[in-house]
């Protein structure tokens, strides 16, 4: 039954039924409406307090747990619940994989409405913690206070924080002591930066007043052991910048690439900023199957290096190359997949919209002594056309790995026009992948599907699909 609590409703003894989109779970209210709520596990029985009432559903939170799900485990992170990162850290990993697989299947079936083969088993990640090679943190002088801190009555003179944005709160940062997503020295570097900044009165960013020296921190690591650290400063305070950068260079001599940016825009994106090298080189090296890839501050690289290797192996297997094929790699990025499959292809043509990525792709190919890869820059819908195919030859296999929005309809139409026998579609968003597969269904059938978990403790999942001409 429901009872009023101020202007909100409390539903008692509600069973959590399923895991839904964006990492929230799903239940049903007594009035039949769906309830979406975070930090619970399917199988839990809870009292739910509604936070928002919509026309067809409620948004709520669990205020009391009566029964624990058999799939529930204790989160390892002290920040779980407040931090919006690892939303499934309280769920057994085997069950996380179940729901990720279910999400892919439901999207392909409900959105794509296409005939599907039996899914191949979702590939789980050997590492479920400390698997990320890139983390970004924010500085703020408006630290988010947790419920426990507020209830303690403790006065906090220092409100500086270095950590993650609270979901839906652009001006609040949750101070992070230990993050379980990136291996050390990531935590040590972050905590030492915070300590040094506080001790030396270096100001943390104030998002409302738009002032302060320290703005963001990025740490990238590689399987080679190399480390990149980049700090975004908001104010052009030469003394403060040199003080922090000299400290980092001396305190962490193992940093391979130490860089900074002075960013006085309203947003903190790096891609239109001039990056200043303070010490070392402006890139780190990642290694995969004997190939080396340079990663600079602006490079896109899969954030789970070990699982990226598994993803690329599946992609290469689906392509079924014999050494005689011309392969097109659409949305090639820095050319990682293109070079990874090049050993088993006659020629690989990579296309990418970001000029800096193509510069990296060409440099990586030269570094790896790969001579059968060519890379071209341009907007995919404008570059991938009849003229391009006439110039570079009819492809035997096309690999496409678009961003979350999927492929532009003009690209899909061109794919159909190429009449290529085989397409391997790698996706980080099975919903847009399903939409694109539906557009190709008349000419191509899905013959293999394999989801890959790149992001344990989250709801995100990659998916690889092999299409063959009907």
Predicted regions and their residues:
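Rossmann-like S-adenosyl-L-methionine
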Residues: 2-13, 21, 25, 236-470
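Short, acidic/hydrophobic/Gly-rich beta-strand patch recurrent on exposed beta strands
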Residues: 25-30, 163-166, 361
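Short, conserved phosphate/pyrophosphate- and ester-handling motifs at nucleotide-, phospho-/glycolipid
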Residues: 43, 182, 304
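Internal alpha/beta scaffold segment
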Residues: 171-207, 211-213, 221, 235-259
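Short, aliphatic-rich beta-strand segments
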Residues: 219, 225-234, 292-296
């Amino acid at each position: 039954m429901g009872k009023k609590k101020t202007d909100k409703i409390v539903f008692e003894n509600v069973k959590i039924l399923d895991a839904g989109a964006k990492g929230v779970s799903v239940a049903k209210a007594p009035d039949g409406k769906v309830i979406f709520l975070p930090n619970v596990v399917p199988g839990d029985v809870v009292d739910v307090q509604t936070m928002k009432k919509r026309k067809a559903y409620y948004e709520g939170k669990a205020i009391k747990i009566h029964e624990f799900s058999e799939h529930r485990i204790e989160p390892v992170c002290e920040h779980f619940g407040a931090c919006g990162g690892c939303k499934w850290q309280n769920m057994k990993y085997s069950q996380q994989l179940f729901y990720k697989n279910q999400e892919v299947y439901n999207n392909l079936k409900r959105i794509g409405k296409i005939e599907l083969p039996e899914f191949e088993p979702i590939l789980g990640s050997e590492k479920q913690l400390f698997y990320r090679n890139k983390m970004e943190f924010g500085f703020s002088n408006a630290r988010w206070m947790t419920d426990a801190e507020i209830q303690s009555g403790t006065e906090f003179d220092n409100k500086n924080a270095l950590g993650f944005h609270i979901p839906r709160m652009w001006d609040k940062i949750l101070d992070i002591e230990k993050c379980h997503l990136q291996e050390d020295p990531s935590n040590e570097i972050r905590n030492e930066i915070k300590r040094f900044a506080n001790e030396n009165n270096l100001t943390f960013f104030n998002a409302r007043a738009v002032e302060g020296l320290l703005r963001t921190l990025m740490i990238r690591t590689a399987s080679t052991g190399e480390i990149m650290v980049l700090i975004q400063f908001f104010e052009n305070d030469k003394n403060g910048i040199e003080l922090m950068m000299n400290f980092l260079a001396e305190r962490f001599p193992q940093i391979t690439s130490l860089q900074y940016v002075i960013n006085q825009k309203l947003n903190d994106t790096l891609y239109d900023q001039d990056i200043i090298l303070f010490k070392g080189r402006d890139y780190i090296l990642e290694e995969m199957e004997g190939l080396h890839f340079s990663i600079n501050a602006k490079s896109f690289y899969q954030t789970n290096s070990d699982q990226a290797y598994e993803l690329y192996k599946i992609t290469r297997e689906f392509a079924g190359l014999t050494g005689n094929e011309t392969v097109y790699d659409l949305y090639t990025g820095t050319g990682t997949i293109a070079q990874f499959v090049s050993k088993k292809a006659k020629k690989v043509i990579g296309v990418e919209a970001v000029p800096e990525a193509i510069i990296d792709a060409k440099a990586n190919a030269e570094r790896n002594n790969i001579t059968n890869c060519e890379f071209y820059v341009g907007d995919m819908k404008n570059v991938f056309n009849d003229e391009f195919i006439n110039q570079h030859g009819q492809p035997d296999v096309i690999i496409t790995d678009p961003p979350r929005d999927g492929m532009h309809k003009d690209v899909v139409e061109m794919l159909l026009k190429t009449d290529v026998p085989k397409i391997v579609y790698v996706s980080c968003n099975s919903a847009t992948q399903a939409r694109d597969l539906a557009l190709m269904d008349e000419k191509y059938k899905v013959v293999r599907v394999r989801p890959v978990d790149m992001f344990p403790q989250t709801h995100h999942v990659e998916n690889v699909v092999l299409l063959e001409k009907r």
